[in-house]
Amino acid sequence: MSQKKKASHPAINLMAGGTAGLFEALCCHPLDTIKVRMQIYRRVAGIEHVKPPGFIKTGRTIYQKEGFLALYKGLGAVVIGIIPKMAIRFSSYEFYRTLLVNKESGIVSTGNTFVAGVGAGITEAVLVVNPMEVVKIRLQAQHLTPSEPNAGPKYNNAIHAAYTIVKEEGVSALYRGVSLTAARQATNQGANFTVYSKLKEFLQNYHQMDVLPSWETSCIGLISGAIGPFSNAPLDTIKTRLQKDKSISLEKQSGMKKIITIGAQLLKEEGFRALYKGITPRVMRVAPGQAVTFTVYEYVREHLENLGIFKKNDTPKPKPLK
């Protein structure tokens, strides 16, 4: 059963994770574009009754005015960062679990599984996710937002956007909002890995098999992926505004003061519900994304192991949490 499962070779984790991330991006990136547009929407000045558009209307507007490919704006930045992101996520998660395993029983408790997930989320946020998202959000936000109706495209692609941001604003601009990104990724991955591990263990024991059917893996990935967005939606909304906003007044403030300023401005101008703006497409983006990620990851890893190209690590994985 799962207690006897051998650890995969690091190269297998890298290849399986990268492939899973690529499929996730291709399948779910349009939902992320809609989510970002909803979060950065500004009410039209002087017209109180104008409400921010909803998920379907936002997606339809993007498609009608900018074309189908506009839904994939910023995809280049995601694809460029997806392989190291997934490699860091899965490898760091396994590394932290190894540190937290009970040396006598070989068991990782539920609490320590959550801590390992939190550590993996923080690690990926600092090394990959934040710079990638700054570039992605700039690309997604540069066309036809209500507050900038006549603005032309400033960035041609992900590489050009990254170069322009660093040239005009410095390397530190790529880490704008990193504390919020780290907090978001930490809660996401903590909940994600904990729920996924528990559900996977339950189904493995129920079926008396190590390899679950793909549809079951998708279901538990969907469930685990849906939890995080509800707990940290305000952080994600503030982070998106912070990474898009380049105002001089904000540049003079400390990181925490920027967060407080943007949060207070959101509450004052748009109300409490603005902190949860984009929650629907975010759940629709993250939950199916995790379903795709875990399903593809498990599938590719199993097939790479069966090919026998890489030798498995002889050290067993920590026993499932009890």
Swiss-Prot record:
Annotated transmembrane regions: 11-31, 68-88, 114-134, 177-193, 219-235, 278-295
CC annotations in GO: mitochondrial inner membrane; mitochondrion
InterPro entries the UniProt entry points to: Mit_carrier, Mitochondrial_sb/sol_carrier, Mt_carrier_dom_sf, TXTP-like
Keyword Transport on entry: yes
An annotated Gene Ontology molecular function: succinate:fumarate antiporter activity
Induction summary: By ethanol or acetate as sole carbon sources. Repressed by glucose.
Spans of repeat Solcar: 8-99, 111-202, 212-303
UniProt-listed Gene3D superfamilies: Mitochondrial carrier domain
Highest taxon of source: Eukaryota
Keywords annotated in UniProt: Membrane, Mitochondrion, Mitochondrion inner membrane, Repeat, Transmembrane, Transmembrane helix, Transport
A Gene Ontology biological process term: fumarate transport
Membrane topology per record: Multi-pass membrane protein
Compartments, as annotated in UniProt: Mitochondrion inner membrane
Family of the protein in this entry: Belongs to the mitochondrial carrier (TC 2.A.29) family.
PANTHER family xref list: SUCCINATE/FUMARATE MITOCHONDRIAL TRANSPORTER-RELATED, SUCCINATE_FUMARATE MITOCHONDRIAL TRANSPORTER
The protein, known as: Succinate/fumarate mitochondrial transporter
Organism this protein belongs to: Saccharomyces cerevisiae (strain ATCC 204508 / S288c)
